[in-house]
């Protein structure tokens, strides 16, 4: 079970299939995030290695990874966002790919 900080919530995307941990007081993923990730996923093949720079809470990376078997490196330098990303990846059982 993933623990949430006092100011965090779990949001869902792509129906209820994907769960993202977000800070209630910080930037949250939006339609723009999903549109960008949707366009990117269409050119990513299963054998690719993908780097997501400034990954934030990993919403775009998790969305892209849902649609293929590529390997992803999600890179984030802000401690809180990186923590949310790690826990979101675990929540979606994608630790072996992201």
What kind of region is each of these model predictions?
Residues 7-9, 23, 72-74:
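N-terminal start-of-chain detector that recognizes signal peptides
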Residues 1-6, 84:
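Compositionally biased, low-hydrophobicity segments enriched in charged and small polar residues
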Residues 3, 11-46, 55-67:
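SAM-dependent Rossmann-like transferase core, predominantly class I methyltransferases
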């Amino acid at each position: 079970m993933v623990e949430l900080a006092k100011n965090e919530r779990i949001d869902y995307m792509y129906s209820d299939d994907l769960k993202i941990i977000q800070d209630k007081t910080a930037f949250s993923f939006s339609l723009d995030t999903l549109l960008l990730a949707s366009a990117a996923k269409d050119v990513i093949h299963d054998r690719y290695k993908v780097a997501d720079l400034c990954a934030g809470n990993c919403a775009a990376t998790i969305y892209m990874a849902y649609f293929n078997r590529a390997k992803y490196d999600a890179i984030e330098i802000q401690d809180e966002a990186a923590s949310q990303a790690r826990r979101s990846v675990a929540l979606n059982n994608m630790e072996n790919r992201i």
